[in-house]
Amino acid sequence: MKYNLGYLFDLLVVITNKDLKVRYKSSMLGYLWSVANPLLFAMIYYFIFKLVMRVQIPNYTVFLITGLFPWQWFASSATNSLFSFIANAQIIKKTVFPRSVIPLSNVMMEGLHFLCTIPVIVVFLFVYGMTPSLSWVWGIPLIAIGQVIFTFGVSIIFSTLNLFFRDLERFVSLGIMLMFYCTPILYASDMIPEKFSWIITYNPLASMILSWRDLFMNGTLNYEYISILYFTGIILTVVGLSIFNKLKALLNKSNFC
């Protein structure tokens, strides 16, 4: 069955809106959690790395949040995608639509949370005597689209495989924690010894974080990093959709697809 783009967009909006309402139902702070949660983590890491370990990085608060906020978008999307099909089982059983929209809606929801953190970045830029750049106007959409593609590729793989391998959740949690420390979020990439430089070279998440940091802190677009983000994102999406389509017959028997 073929679907037009208008229908898919409307469907994406409806599912994303539903997920937002479910998440913040009976929550006193509501959408403020989208800012409070990453900001709290930033305060903890600032205390540990700047005040205790005395990491010598200029404007460390801005440095930290420009890496941590985009990371939260990716990590939350990847983690929540594990149960995205299971959480939407009732909709899947009752409605005919492309099931791949479900993990995409989760990525978009976390992307909206990320957008809510950009004003926080702006405030800290002014606090440290820095200002937003005009390049943000086209730079934010450019990098954000790349991150959507990349994160969707990861999410469709996780959400599909988790229906068959429930232990995947534990491997994903460990993997995300490992990648967090292998990605220059808390530290600068030039602090890594040369013999370990491959950690940055072969880590597409590093390209993602450094793309955002260059834009927010310097007002520049690093097209090398952005190209890596898009390239790996497209590959992951193609692989993810291939896995999804190959397992669709099995998913149909489980009423999940």
Report the location of each language-model feature:
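Hydrophobic transmembrane alpha-helices and immediately adjacent juxtamembrane helices
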Residues: 1-257
